[in-house]
């Protein structure tokens, strides 16, 4: 079965999730929602999913278009408000969190606030929401980007929106892991070379000799993806 970056990234993210974890995703998180469902169906049936709307263990029939879709509240085990959510995070109750970012630096700090001088920005971005609070409080954070280039992976952020317990970064080229406070390539995706990653990263990044390749999606994984996302929403962030 054929696959592309959307399927490969969703699978790579899903495989990082563990059974029994409480997992949260932020706003605009189509791929994380797909990864969470994939993990629940195939290897983590006891995973607890808390979405940005406050729904606990939502079970939508198909992948919603938005991470705030009403389908993520219907039939849930419960709904928590924002105060309860932040209290949960600060108590260490969130095991894994998915978060996106516009810029990522070598230490896996993120910028989702501005491009350019903060006093006179070239671009004003949506902002980090609660990222500054939850990144250092969640037990581990998985960052994801659907474009891997020198504009995204920069030596110095234009603004530090959030920093914290980032464990891995998943992109269309590779999976990175933070080692001794700095990002390094853990796995190269099929067909991607170390040179391609270095050329598209705006800071020196370690790619170990004999770096393993991300195993391609299995037929079972692809079947679940296509059943849960028949409208191919997973491709929207790659356009």
Predicted regions and their residues:
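Alpha-helix boundary/capping detector
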Residues: 51, 134, 223-227
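N-terminal active-site beta-alpha-beta segment that forms phosphate/nucleotide-binding
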Residues: 1-75
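N-terminal charge/polar-biased segments
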Residues: 1-11, 15, 211-239
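Conserved phosphate- and dinucleotide-binding cores of soluble alpha/beta proteins
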Residues: 62-220
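Short secondary-structure junctions and interdomain/linker hinges
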Residues: 20, 204-208, 232-236
